[in-house]
Design a protein with these regions (language model features):
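A solvent-exposed, acidic/Ser-Thr-rich amphipathic alpha-helical stretch
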Residues: 36-102
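Short beta-strand segments enriched in hydrophobic/aromatic residues
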Residues: 31, 43-44, 102-104, 138-141
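Short, cysteine-centered beta-strand-loop-beta hairpins and adjacent loop/turn segments enriched
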Residues: 105-114
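Flexible low-complexity loop/turn motifs enriched in small/helix-breaking residues
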Residues: 91-95, 151-164
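Exposed loop/turn and edge beta-strand positions of beta-sandwich/beta-sheet ligand-binding modules
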Residues: 83, 114, 118
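Short beta-strand edge/turn micro-motifs at domain boundaries
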Residues: 97-99, 117-153
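C-terminal-biased regions
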Residues: 6, 80-86, 105, 141, ...
């Protein structure tokens, strides 16, 4: 491998990492802005968003549709922010996993407070048309149960094997 090939591979790795960071943090801005199109663009057409104590949403349209739900609109109307910490990313070719904390901060009479704190694991893939999208996102509340810490403990595990 030539020095130029090595440099190109390193640059691509950095670009992939930055693109995944943008994707992970972009969800909060899009969902708080009730931007259905932007939320949808983050997910593969058959993407899944599984929130352990809430619901499993399947398909880009269903996931993006959360921005139009009454409960979400009420939360946004009171003042809230969906935030992600900087993810730990493992890239394996055209597939990747990002592990992070996510939280919902909401406005309350006494000021702002964390309403939800979750462990999140996102499985992503590079799409043929370019860019990365979320194939599967799993959240577990960090409420003292075992599932959240167990998910975070897997941070160095790469993407799950593809199933036929």
């Amino acid at each position: 491998m030539s020095n130029l090939d090595i440099l190109e591979a390193r640059l691509r790795a950095v670009e992939d990492q930055l693109a995944i960071y943008q994707l992970v943090c972009g969800y909060g801005y899009a969902v708080d802005g009730c931007n259905t199109q932007a939320v949808g663009s983050l997910y593969a057409p058959d993407g899944v968003y599984a929130v352990a104590d809430f619901a499993t949403m399947e398909g880009r349209e269903r996931i993006a549709g959360i921005t139009n739900e009454e409960g979400h609109r009420t939360l946004v109307g009171r003042g809230c922010g969906h935030m992600s910490t900087l993810p730990y990313v493992v890239i394996d070719g055209d597939r990747a996993v990002a592990t992070c904390h996510t939280m919902v901060v909401e406005h309350r009479a006494e000021g702002f407070g964390v309403a939800r704190l979750s462990a999140s694991r996102l499985q992503l893939s590079r799409k043929p048309e370019g860019g990365w999208q979320i194939d599967h996102r799993q959240n577990f509340m960090l409420d003292g149960g075992a599932a959240g810490p167990a998910l975070l403990a897997r941070l160095q595990q790469g993407p799950a094997p593809l199933t036929p």
